[in-house]
């Protein structure tokens, strides 16, 4: 017997020697935290506990010193987004607790981005702590929790800390109103109050009449104290209250997937990432254009350049010059907009009315105010007053010290403007009117009869300046520019102070060039870029070559050289455009090391951060989400494609199509036509924008290597993010919400839920349009792009896949206020959900050499969306989900790879309740002083990953037929690592290290399924999923 046991142990050791395990400890246990980390963790828990209630801890309240606005306390200084949040806080315009936070609103997303940067870029944890305490007491709790979770995730000194799950901190965001009222009614029933009969004493014994006269309220106080003591005993006897936190019919259809709280949190995180990655929208661009136009009208382009040079010459290197320049320019525009288009007498009348209202506020100083009015000594509003009054708005403005550097630069700018006005008046020989002329604005001291003459003179001056700037051939203007240039200080081209104004001047130069090209076109230009000839056919390089030869240009170059030059120029412009987009969108949100007190040189290539894979990650998550919806529908026998084919039947009339669509998406008939028309317009806009973007790219050059083909995927993803074409998915979501917010509304403020049929229909259509555009351009993979020589998959073994419906508990203590002081009552919501049994995948792979490889594992249904068995893999590939991607180092010979489902990195297990996290932290803090606490489990908090219990679709009692696709490919690492984080939302790090598309190889059409399955590095195996209960 002993010999048999030895043989078995020896065999197990031999097998284990050739096994490659990929089980990695992804979560740090609390028992390995240092004392400092435990104290920081306790601070985070104190902040988020009872987030809806006012902060009670005095030691935390003492840390509130306001929002820190010192640029030296932040890595990289304070940028425009952060400064906008600081200004909103000074004006008390940040989102407060009485307002609803929504990622569908642009201003809310901008506040989230700014608060996140204030927390993530804090120089030390003390700055982070003070800002968090101030924000905890002054802003919306949903906004604070989202920003804090992102900052804790991205900071280097908080990697060991966790934030409790959002669904426990803010459960009202994910529960229905009926569940919330049920929880609060249960708590009201436990808190008994004395009845009226008890208060008046009719049910009590009669007391001494003398005592009742001397102490009339003694009996009432005794009864109240007795009732309160009974309530405390009731609560002590029932510390755990369990309520049912689900709706009727939650296990029907796909509701187990769409109504799952963890999945709703994942979708909210995905939409939040979409909002944070969204580029400048049409609203922002229109605002920027309007600001530039107003600035050119009132100040003049020559004056702006001259003053910018003077300011940049005088500013020091250690000062945040870009912020000061933007502040002064913004204030000048606000001041001009306030008085633009108003009547002169109306301005004067309104100012005196504001002055009288100011007198009412200070009744004690009426005599002094009257004297100030008579003497003309009244407080000015952000400007210089000569011969007129400019009163009002001083109470709402932030106070600034008289020694502040901001006032120095703003005053110097205004002084230069006044001097230029005087010089311009002397040159033109105009008479000075009474009052101050600022930026060609009419003074209040001018007479009304002179209004038409002055306006005509100003219009003539504008036309003359515009003509001079457009033609650029007036000797006097050139001489004046030369004189200005001679007076400026010469600085190095790499000087940090020039970075902030280079982009603005570059845009102005481009506008000048475009205006000159309208009158004098250049000899060599981008001929016909984006235009179409011969009907709908886009212009090609050969057409441009014909135009060049027809005009007898570039005679010394051959046709091949001209075509090569056009192709090279187009690729350079495309690469430059992508780099500029990557710098503008999210270059500050990745982990970038900045020098303290200085802004990063975003225009320099050595610090440019490539993050274009972020758009691919978002698009990949959308595809995977739609595939899971399709899998759940197929598992429940809901035929999607059958209804789609009926809708697209050409024999049906338009009214019949509308009727079928109404039956499919089940929306209100009164708004059905508007919603469907809006969705149709969205689909058309997406197709047009993607077509325009891809027509500007030389697709023939991208059909070679797989790395080059990924650029098409990145371009399409940029369109969905709104970075190209201005038709991003957030714009689509906002439009759908606007048309669908009457009946389908949730407490997140977004207005949509994944269970909404309109949302599912829109997502499916968007993903289908994107896939069709990509497949039409790139086609399928070639055989050499799919095979891996010298590698063969011998066998793949999978455990039995089983799913079950179970009851899950959710901590709802933050949903209600604790009525009893000193007693923390645990309120638990019980909900049914779908879960799966943990399984393992064993793969036996043979390699002829040592090499790095990546293994992709896909899971998809064996049936198509019409319920047909035996459908081709090409018809079902869009319904496959990427279970895992593993990076391994294959050795020469046989390799056994063992993978557990609980080790998939982009999924998360059940979160630890807030009460349990707090208890473990406090026990560990005590253990640091006395003895270590043994047996502490790993804690799981908010991480934004996909819930692990939804990894498999709901099975069937007889077994749901599924297929497992395993593909082994050589690892093609990117030369420049685009995405550094090890784990991102919905995707693992192994897929990001590989240069192939994230959906490879099922993201392209499969023309020959047999040829694909005959490859030695590809294996397709049948599996079944059984529903236990």
From Swiss-Prot:
SUPFAM superfamilies: E set domains, Hemocyanin, N-terminal domain. It comes from the Eukaryota. GO terms for biological process: energy homeostasis. InterPro entries: Hemocyanin/hexamerin (IPR013788), Hemocyanin_C (IPR005203), Hemocyanin_C_sf (IPR037020), Hemocyanin_N (IPR005204), Hemocyanin_N_sf (IPR036697), Ig_E-set (IPR014756). Induction: By ecdysone. Disulfide bonds: none annotated. Fat body. GO terms for cellular component: extracellular space. Residues 1-17 form the signal peptide. One of its GO terms (molecular function) is nutrient reservoir activity. PANTHER family: FAT-BODY PROTEIN 1-RELATED, LARVAL STORAGE PROTEIN/PHENOLOXIDASE. This is Fat-body protein 1. It comes from Drosophila melanogaster (Fruit fly).
